[in-house]
Amino acid sequence: MDKVRIAVLVSGGGTNLQALIDAQSSGVISSGTIALVISNNPDAYALERAAVAGIATEVVNKRELGSQLAFEDKIMEILNCNKIDLIVLAGFMSILSEHFTTMYPERILNVHPSLIPSFCGKGYYGLRVHEEALAYGVKVTGATVHYVNEIPDGGKILLQKAVEI
């Protein structure tokens, strides 16, 4: 049986990507292989992490392409050319439109740094999520893995892990 071909979309340092690479190397991820890393930031350290692991990389710059539609179409072209089965958003700082998400139903996963439905949705990403949680005074936070749909952080929840503050 062929392994599921995974693309990881990133924007920054790639700590979540590194965790996925390590899980693949140790055999925790055994039914899939990270075949491609795509970044919307040409300076993302995640690209270096991928290169060290021998994973193909691509950069798609929305500013250069001029529109969200052109940006997403380019990503879809790359995904299709690489025969990608599953897309993982790991610190990808761009919201994908319905145009994109409907092309990959239940094939896009996101790692969100809170226990959805808290501190999620448009504008809640990266450190802002943690800052808001601390400012609100929550005693427990965590992370959520969910399917991506047209609603930011609105897809079906697959896994949550809580962490005490």
Describe each region flagged by the PLM.
Residues 1-165:
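One-carbon transfer enzymes
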